Amino acid sequence: MSILSFLLGEKKKSASVAKERLQLIIAHERVGGRPPADYLPALQKELVAVISKYVQISNDDIRVSLERQDDLEVLEVKIEIPQA
């Protein structure tokens, strides 16, 4: 972080904000919150809304899944972006 960005209060990038949100959701799940199926549809809608700001996509162009194997959780996001 440079002194100038510190003094002017540089905005966080949307990717870093999204990453923090996903980390919070997964951490909440590990503690024993609600089942993962509850938030995945909402997460998918939010991802479509954010990506649609930059590229035209539909709900069918994105897939979100959470797989659990023993102590490992994998959140997988697949996005089909149309060719320009």
Swiss-Prot record:
Keywords: Cell cycle, Cell division
Gene3D superfamilies noted in UniProt: Cell division topological specificity factor MinE (3.30.1070.10)
Function: Prevents the cell division inhibition by proteins MinC and MinD at internal division sites while permitting inhibition at polar sites. This ensures cell division at the proper site by restricting the formation of a division septum at the midpoint of the long axis of the cell.
A Gene Ontology BP annotation from the UniProt entry: cell division
NCBIfam families named in the record: minE, PRK00296.1, PRK13989.1
Lineage, uppermost ranks: Bacteria, Pseudomonadati, Pseudomonadota, Betaproteobacteria, Burkholderiales
SUPFAM superfamilies associated with the record: Cell division protein MinE topological specificity domain
UniProt cross-references to InterPro entries, sorted A to Z: MinE (IPR005527), MinE_sf (IPR036707)
Similarity section: Belongs to the MinE family.
Organism: Burkholderia multivorans (strain ATCC 17616 / 249)
Pfam family, any one: MinE
Name of the featured protein: Cell division topological specificity factor
